[in-house]
């Protein structure tokens, strides 16, 4: 079972039990995985923070970089969850990008860019109704392949640029 699948099924983005991940690996894969974890490049081993005592702590795995975790979650949602269960994707996307959720800031841009670049109109229509869409659009439309930019995108960019908010260009687009 993948680390991302575990996170989604257990509604946690931290502290995946190392023992849980290892039980799905062959001995050769375990050796490679252990060496990979020892380097702390993309994943790292930690001790469970909530358990006390020298013999009660278990090793857990966390992502070294939250943005890499968020990228993998967005990819898993759009490439694995959505084709099999659109309603589940919709519920998770809304939950994970709701105001105050710890994934919102990192996950929303990846959902936007991946949905747009993969031309997933069903997902694009769904996320375009979410409260974060306009802000993410302004910041990340530039990451979309030029051939995928629509006339609606151009019109929205023009309206943003023509807005009469003082300092908008400097604050939002340049800085």
PLM regions with names:
Residues 1-80:
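Extended helical regulatory/linker subdomains that flank P-loop NTPase cores
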Residues 12, 57-59, 75-175:
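Extended amphipathic alpha-helical scaffold segments
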């Amino acid at each position: 079972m993948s680390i991302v699948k575990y996170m989604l099924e257990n509604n946690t983005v931290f502290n995946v039990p190392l023992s849980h991940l290892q039980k799905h690996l062959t001995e050769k894969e375990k050796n490679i995985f252990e060496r990979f974890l020892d380097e702390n490049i993309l994943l790292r081993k930690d001790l469970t923070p909530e358990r006390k005592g020298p013999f009660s702590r278990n090793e857990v795995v966390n992502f070294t970089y939250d943005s890499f975790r968020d990228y993998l979650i967005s990819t898993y949602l759009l490439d694995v969850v959505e084709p099999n269960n659109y309603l589940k994707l919709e519920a998770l996307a809304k939950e994970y990008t709701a105001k105050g959720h710890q994934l919102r800031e990192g996950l929303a841009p990846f959902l936007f860019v991946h949905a747009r670049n993969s031309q997933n109109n069903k997902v694009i229509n769904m996320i375009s109704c979410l409260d974060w869409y306009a802000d993410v659009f302004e910041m990340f439309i530039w990451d979309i392949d030029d051939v995928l930019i629509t006339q609606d995108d151009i019109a929205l960019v023009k309206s943003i640029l023509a807005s009469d908010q003082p300092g908008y260009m400097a604050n939002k687009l340049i800085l």
